[in-house]
């Protein structure tokens, strides 16, 4: 049997809705927006790494990170 702890007692209310499903889409659109923003962030990092996105006055040197 599981041991009861103070931390478990504090976190129990967060798990009280386990197994319940709210009808409809819920927060799915919000998740989709954040996934799209994360994709844009990753694409910008990739373009900076490939030097296909050039920012004036900013020198990008990846050698210090051991990446290049």
UniProtKB/Swiss-Prot annotation:
Gene3D superfamilies, sorted: Photosystem II reaction center protein H
Function, in words: One of the components of the core complex of photosystem II (PSII), required for its stability and/or assembly. PSII is a light-driven water:plastoquinone oxidoreductase that uses light energy to abstract electrons from H(2)O, generating O(2) and a proton gradient subsequently used for ATP formation. It consists of a core antenna complex that captures photons, and an electron transfer chain that converts photonic excitation into a charge separation.
HAMAP family for the chain: PSII_PsbH
Pfam families for the chain: PsbH
Assigned protein family: Belongs to the PsbH family.
InterPro entries found in the cross-reference section: PSII_PsbH (IPR001056), PSII_PsbH_sf (IPR036863)
Entry annotated with the keyword Lipoprotein: no
Stored NCBIfam families: PRK02624.1
GO molecular function: phosphate ion binding
The protein's name: Photosystem II reaction center protein H
One GO term of the biological process aspect: protein stabilization
Compartments it resides in: Cellular thylakoid membrane
GO cellular component, one term: plasma membrane-derived thylakoid membrane
This protein's UniProt keywords: Membrane, Photosynthesis, Photosystem II, Thylakoid, Transmembrane, Transmembrane helix
Major subcellular site: membrane
Membrane topology: Single-pass membrane protein
Subunit architecture: PSII is composed of 1 copy each of membrane proteins PsbA, PsbB, PsbC, PsbD, PsbE, PsbF, PsbH, PsbI, PsbJ, PsbK, PsbL, PsbM, PsbT, PsbX, PsbY, PsbZ, Psb30/Ycf12, peripheral proteins PsbO, CyanoQ (PsbQ), PsbU, PsbV and a large number of cofactors. It forms dimeric complexes.
């Amino acid at each position: 049997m599981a041991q009861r702890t103070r931390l478990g007692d504090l976190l129990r209310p967060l798990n009280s809705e386990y197994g319940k499903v709210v009808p409809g889409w819920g927060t799915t659109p919000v998740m989709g927006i954040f996934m799209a923003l994360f994709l844009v962030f990753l694409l910008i990092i990739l373009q900076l790494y490939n030097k296909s996105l050039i920012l004036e006055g900013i020198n990008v040197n990846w050698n210090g990170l051991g990446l290049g």
